């Protein structure tokens, strides 16, 4: 690593962007706006170092309709969310949804599932997994479903999927339910299931 400062700033950028779709070129552009000139090839190399050293997991996108893995716009999740708190030195309430998404990813990974982030039309599905029985499952993660806009967005993405595999919404809501084949589960209950 030739530029330690750029590498450190890149790792902080990724930590602040957990649960967001990113690419080396848009990271490079964002860092250039912050007066840090770093080429997207260097960004790609530094990300590879962070993934290979088990600081981040890289999760590819999957086009649900076309049934194929996409080559760009991955998401990155931290192996330990404590790294984020240590490096960024702050906790911001608006990040809780992304932190919850990171926790759900870690649990899906722990369960041995193959995990992708999903895309169906203009909608994003937080996680598509292939379980031990080689069956698919779909997950949306939201801090709370109490906001009607959030509920509509999360439910509509899952309803857009035209198969009969299980579909879940994971949130911090205490009251959970099943609606139109979509099971809404509390994060703590879900974590303790298996």
Predicted regions and their residues:
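Domain-level recognition of nuclease-like catalytic cores that cleave nucleotide substrates
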Residues: 173-194
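Short amphipathic alpha-helical segment that frequently serves as the phosphate-/nucleotide-binding helix
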Residues: 4, 152-156
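Conserved beta-strand segments of alpha/beta enzyme cores
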Residues: 114, 166, 181-183
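Switch/connector loops and helix/strand junctions flanking conserved nucleotide-binding motifs
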Residues: 86, 148-149, 176-180
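Accessory nucleic acid-recognition modules appended to NTPase machines
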Residues: 1-135
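Active-site ExK catalytic segment of metal-dependent nucleases
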Residues: 135-146, 154
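Short, hydrophobic beta-strand segments that form beta-sheet elements in well-ordered domains
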Residues: 164-171
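Short, conserved loop/helix-junction motifs that constitute active-site signature segments
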Residues: 159-162
């Amino acid at each position: 690593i030739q530029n330690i400062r750029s590498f450190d700033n890149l790792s902080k950028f990724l930590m602040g962007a957990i649960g967001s779709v990113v690419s080396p070129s848009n990271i490079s552009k964002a860092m250039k706006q912050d007066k840090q000139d770093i080429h997207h090839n260097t960004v790609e190399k530094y990300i590879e170092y962070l993934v290979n050293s088990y600081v981040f997991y890289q999760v590819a996108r999957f086009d649900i309709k076309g049934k194929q893995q996409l080559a760009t716009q991955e998401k990155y999740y931290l192996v330990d969310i404590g790294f984020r708190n240590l490096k960024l030195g702050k906790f911001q309430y608006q990040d809780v949804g992304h932190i919850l998404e990171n926790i759900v990813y870690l649990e899906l990974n722990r369960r041995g599932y193959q995990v992708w982030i999903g895309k169906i039309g203009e909608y994003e599905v937080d996680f598509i997994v292939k379980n031990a029985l080689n069956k698919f499952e779909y997950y949306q993660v939201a801090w709370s479903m109490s906001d009607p806009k959030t509920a509509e967005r999360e439910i509509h993405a899952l309803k857009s999927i035209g198969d009969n595999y299980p579909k879940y919404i994971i949130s911090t809501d205490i009251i959970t339910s099943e609606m139109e084949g979509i099971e809404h589960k509390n994060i703590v209950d879900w974590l303790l299931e298996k």
